[in-house]
A protein has these predicted regions:
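A short alpha-helix capping/helix-coil boundary motif
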Residues: 15-18, 71-75, 99
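Vicinal oxygen chelate
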Residues: 33, 84-126
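Catalytic core of tubulin tyrosine ligase-like
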Residues: 40
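A beta-strand edge to alpha-helix "cap/lid" segment located at domain peripheries
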Residues: 99, 131-134
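Short secondary-structure junctions
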Residues: 45-51, 103-108
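N-terminal beta-strand motif that seeds the catalytic metal site of vicinal oxygen chelate
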Residues: 3-37, 64-65, 81-83, 133-134
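Conserved short beta-strand elements that form part of the metal-binding/catalytic scaffold
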Residues: 46-80, 126-132
Length: 134
């Protein structure tokens, strides 16, 4: 299966990288799967799809990481293992997070000189935002 990579401009469709140690799949706890899927689609542009078993799944914008929302598992409301999503602009993404029902729990500037922020998604999970400084 090939996926197109987007985000830094259109690139030719190519298969995802397969390498030992690569982060490849994420399960995100959710109370309302449809609401969580819409949140990540609208904020980050993730592709949303139905898997063969009927579960709602996602693919990131560059076709390198996929995953699904899971019910019956408590959210991660406090950072333990903390995932960061790379974005073009943390400031713009903070606005999108709030506009789509998320909550900012660590504002921009707390990790200076890194450009980061943390938010709580509709399922109660805390996730980080990261902007490449270059």
């Amino acid at each position: 299966m090939t996926r197109s990579r987007v985000g830094f401009g259109k690139m030719p469709a190519m298969p995802p990288t397969r390498a030992h140690g690569k982060l490849c799949y994420v399960e995100i706890p959710a109370v309302d799967v449809a609401r969580s899927a819409a949140f990540y689609r609208d904020v980050f542009g993730w592709g949303i799809r139905q898997r063969g078993d009927g579960r709602t799944a996602f693919d990131d914008t560059v076709g390198e990481v996929s995953g699904a929302w899971v019910t019956g598992r408590p959210p991660s409301p406090e950072p333990g293992l903390l995932l960061y999503v790379m974005v073009d602009s943390v400031a713009d993404t903070v606005d999108a997070v709030v506009a789509h029902g998320g909550e900012i729990v660590q504002p921009i500037g707390s990790d200076a000189p890194e450009v980061t922020a943390r938010f709580r998604d509709p399922g109660g999970n805390v996730i980080g935002l990261y902007q490449d400084p270059s």
